[in-house]
C-alpha cells in the first residue's frame, strides 16, 4: 500500500506516462487527498513521457542503442528537480499520511490507473488525430518560404519536420529520425502542443496555472538539453 498520496502520485506520474501525472494529481485533489498547492507541485515534475514508450519507441526510432544514459537523464532530472522544489518553493506541502483504512492498495491503485489510462488514451487519440491533420500547415509554410531566394539555403526539410514535432511529437519523432537526435530529445520534456493542450485542460479543471506548469517544464527542458549535449559529445 502507499503511505501517502504524494508517493502514489509520484510513482504513477513517472511510470504510467503522460498525461497520467497531471490527471492523478487532479483526481487526488478532487477527492481532497491533497491540497491545490500539492497538486501543483506534483504536476511540476511528474507529468512525463512514459519510460516504456521512451525506451521501446523513441530511442530506437532515433537510432540510440545505449539507452541507460538517456533514460537516467530523462527521468533523473525531473526527480532531482522535484526534490529541489520540495526543499524550496513547495516546503509547505505536507502530504499527510493516509489513515490505515483509506490507504490505497497496490491492486486498487493499478485498477484505478488502468481506468484513468483508458480515458486518457481516448482523449490523447483525439488530440493526436487533430494535430496530425495540421501537419499540412508546416508543409504549406515551407513551400511559401521556398519562393523567397534569401531562405533557399535554410534546411527547409528539417524545419518542416521540426515544426511537425512541435505540433504533435508522437508523429513528429518519425519525421525527425533522419536528423541528429538532440533536437527531438530536447522537445520530449515539454511534449509539443498536443501535450500542452491536454495538460492545460486538466490543470484548468483543478484551477491550476498553465504558465506555472510551463515554466517548470521549460526549466527541466533546459537542464535535460544541457545534459544530453554532454552525453552525445561524450560518445554515448
Residue ranges: model-predicted function:
Residues 2-62, 163-177, 182-206:
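Alpha-helical membrane segments and immediately flanking helix-loop junctions
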Residues 8, 115, 119, 123, ...:
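Alpha-helical transmembrane segments of multi-pass membrane proteins
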Residues 13, 17, 73-81, 127, ...:
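Alpha-helical transmembrane segments in multi-pass membrane proteins
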Residues 33-87, 202-226:
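Membrane-core helix-loop-helix motifs of multi-pass transport proteins
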Residues 37-45, 99-103, 158:
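Short, amphipathic, aromatic/basic-enriched membrane-interface segments that mark the entry/exit
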Residues 68-150, 226:
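Selected transmembrane alpha-helices and immediately adjacent juxtamembrane segments
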Residues 114-188, 192:
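Transmembrane helical segments that form the transport core of multi-pass membrane transport proteins
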Residues 227-236:
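Juxtamembrane boundary at the C-terminal end of a transmembrane helix
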